[in-house]
């Protein structure tokens, strides 16, 4: 009898725990994806803070001297970074307990793999948590679908690109100057500015910002006043009210007169669908572009592609970009290039003015 009561009590305890985890009445929804998520960003964040302050230098290139990235080794907030794993390690996941010594692990591996893997697991599980909460509330799943865009971008940069290049040393350093260094080297090696998927991503991000600003300003400018002139317009509304707070017909009429009639939406659902789809699809394409360039399917190269009737090259901005790419690549891998052959053997044509 005692055993049966203990079993029932433990079962009810587990049941109460399950109900608490999946309850939508909590101030912050946890969910089963949240149970999986919580440890990973905590590990990534805590290791990042410790490493940013005190991590020893990492032998990132496999040649030359180790690169320090932490504050205690002479960097500041702008120049500090978590240095990627050494090129000597390749794509191996090298836990600290497999290293011959802790110093050797710091020298060749460092905390980069640990932080990046836990970060990617954390953001993916956060996306799952968004879907789970939507499911519990009977909502449609598009919030998680929209969040998949930055998840795809982070996965492309931190995982797909190193896999395509063959080692984690090509991953993006976790810091301000490290991010810009990654961008410059990426342009030098893959000509990303001339890749159509990157162009779609730029249109998505900047276009999304423009449309968001336009929508917000139109809504704020066409509020339905429920108060007198002596009171704030905000006092006439309450959170969750049934009635609309702004007049979409007025906003549609204003924008239609500002540009032309069919440039504005007269349907709120269509408008918000457009506002969601535009940046999300753009960022999806950027992530896809990073993933293709990871395997060296690079941007367009129009090097010396314009010639006159006698076959002489007419230099264009594309040739200027290629020269800049070569210069950036030499600065990045100065031991691997004595001088780029493309520049060394190029014929220089002087034109008398």
UniProtKB/Swiss-Prot annotation:
Tyr-161 forms a radical intermediate that is referred to as redox-active TyrZ, YZ or Y-Z. C-terminally processed by CTPA; processing is essential to allow assembly of the oxygen-evolving complex and thus photosynthetic growth. Chlorophyll a ChlzD1 binds at residue 118. Photosystem II (PSII) is a light-driven water:plastoquinone oxidoreductase that uses light energy to abstract electrons from H(2)O, generating O(2) and a proton gradient subsequently used for ATP formation. It consists of a core antenna complex that captures photons, and an electron transfer chain that converts photonic excitation into a charge separation. The D1/D2 (PsbA/PsbD) reaction center heterodimer binds P680, the primary electron donor of PSII as well as several subsequent electron acceptors. This is Photosystem II protein D1. Chlorophyll a PD1 binds at residue 198. [CaMn4O5] cluster binds at residues 170, 189, 332-333, 342, 344. It comes from Cycas taitungensis (Prince sago). The record marks 190 as: Stabilizes free radical intermediate. One of its GO terms (cellular component) is photosystem II. A quinone binds at residues 215, 264-265. It is found in: Plastid, Chloroplast thylakoid membrane. It catalyses: 2 a plastoquinone + 4 hnu + 2 H2O = 2 a plastoquinol + O2. Coiled coil: none annotated. The chain crosses the membrane at residues 29-46, 118-133, 142-156, 197-218, 274-288. The record marks 344-345 as: Cleavage. PSII is composed of 1 copy each of membrane proteins PsbA, PsbB, PsbC, PsbD, PsbE, PsbF, PsbH, PsbI, PsbJ, PsbK, PsbL, PsbM, PsbT, PsbX, PsbY, PsbZ, Psb30/Ycf12, at least 3 peripheral proteins of the oxygen-evolving complex and a large number of cofactors. It forms dimeric complexes.
